[in-house]
Amino acid sequence: MASLTHLDATGAANMVDVSDKAATARTARAEGAIVMRPETLRLIREGDAKKGDVLGTARLAGIMAAKRTHDLIPLCHPLLLSKVRVECEPDAALPGIRITAEVRVQGPTGVEMEALTAVSVACLTVYDMVKAADRGMRIEGIRLLEKSGGRSGSYAADPA
């Protein structure tokens, strides 16, 4: 089992020193979903939510969140991200919205947390924008789908 890189010999939390690591291409993809009543999904699809464009706002919130991950997660490094893509897809089978994020960087550390943060905040934004219609919505299934680059190599999640 790999050691925890954010803990020193005494068990205290520390930001990992990446100053000696080479900048390499790194990518991460994450997913999540927000499950809601069919009527709530219909409001979103038809553009009838009182707060406006739910999916567009959630997409932008996810992008902004990826860029601010270092402000939200204490031991994350600030990164010069080269790409953040957030997709919000209505899914009647849930019913709800499936959200995915892809983040890229040319840097000394990975972007898994940025992808996960983008999905999380996009889901929270959907909740915020339609909570007046459906307070029983559930955010679920947030996970890393895949990552590539860096010393630890590639990772792909088992199919759900």
From Swiss-Prot:
**GO molecular function list:** cyclic pyranopterin monophosphate synthase activity
E.C. no: 4.6.1.17
Q: Which UniProt keywords apply?
A: Lyase, Molybdenum cofactor biosynthesis
* Record-listed substrate binding positions: L75, C76, H77, M113, E114
User: Which reaction is catalysed here?
Assistant: (8S)-3',8-cyclo-7,8-dihydroguanosine 5'-triphosphate = cyclic pyranopterin phosphate + diphosphate
Kindly identify the residues recorded as the active site. D128
Set out the biological process GO terms recorded for this chain's protein.
Mo-molybdopterin cofactor biosynthetic process
SUPFAM superfamilies given in the database record: Molybdenum cofactor biosynthesis protein C, MoaC
Q: Which domain of life is it from?
A: Bacteria
The record's listing under InterPro entries reads: MoaC, MoaC_bact/euk, MoaC_sf, MoCo_biosynth_MoaA/MoaC, Mopterin_CF_biosynth-C_dom
Q: In which pathway does it act?
A: Cofactor biosynthesis; molybdopterin biosynthesis
Q: Which residues form a coiled coil?
A: none
The record describes the protein's role as: Catalyzes the conversion of (8S)-3',8-cyclo-7,8-dihydroguanosine 5'-triphosphate to cyclic pyranopterin monophosphate (cPMP).
Assembly notes = Homohexamer; trimer of dimers.
Name the family: Belongs to the MoaC family.
Q: Which PANTHER family match?
A: MOLYBDOPTERIN COFACTOR SYNTHESIS PROTEIN A (PTHR22960)
Show the HAMAP family listed in the entry: MoaC_B
Q: What is the protein name for this chain?
A: Cyclic pyranopterin monophosphate synthase
